[in-house]
Amino acid sequence: MVAQERQEVAELIHQSTNSWYLANGKDAIFKGPPSEALLFCQVYEDLDPGCCLVAKCRISGRVAGSCFYHPRKTHVSLGIMNVSPDFFGQGIARSLLTKIIQIANDQSLPVRLVSSAQNLDSFSLYTRQGFSPIQAFQDMYLEVPEEGFHNEISGGFEIRKAQLSDVEEMVVLEKRISGIERAKDFKYFIENKRGIWNTLVCRGTNGTLLGFLGSVDH
């Protein structure tokens, strides 16, 4: 993806994601204009410049599909993949995925992804390409009242905003739990140059890092 294609890729993300949700009896996930999805291009290019593949129609020149990927020390992470509904069934997603697998193989790294079990089309694609599920996560939806939550925090923990000095311990904790390292991601969230991230850490009374949580407000 080059800079001139970012807006078109954002429109593709917006259109194809909403199309899938609507086709499966759900509400559109993006409620605003296509420009909302430009955040994906901005953030992913901040983190990994030049790591987005696009498939373009040779006849019309339209962007038919896109996929971001994120090379890390321990793995290559597969980012958001989208194919225009106008180009479904033409093997575009498979071609993009095959290319990224080759990029990872060239670096002798495994490919890691987090995929919704609700999307059987993508689950089938990944399975055919050799992926195997190793861990399940549960989506959680919380309705936050206008006045917010006012839960008391146990005095047995210290919860505060993350600092760059926390990154080393965050990396160690995640590697122990998941076997991966993402130091540059944690630094990016904490530095928060776009002003949209909030990263918290939780420490025990002895100072041990017990957990951390990142969120985005956009």
Predicted segments — roles?
Residues 10-59, 63, 176-199, 204:
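Active-site rim helix/loop that mediates acceptor-substrate recognition in acyltransferases
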Residues 4, 8, 73, 120-121, ...:
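Short alpha-helical
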Residues 76-79, 104-118:
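Conserved GNAT acetyl-CoA-binding A-motif
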Residues 80-83, 89-104, 123-128:
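Conserved acetyl-CoA-binding loop-helix of GNAT-fold acetyltransferases
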Residues 9, 128-218:
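Amide-forming acyltransferase catalytic core, primarily the GNAT-like/NAT-type
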Residues 52-54, 61-70, 77-82, 201, ...:
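Conserved beta-strand in the GNAT
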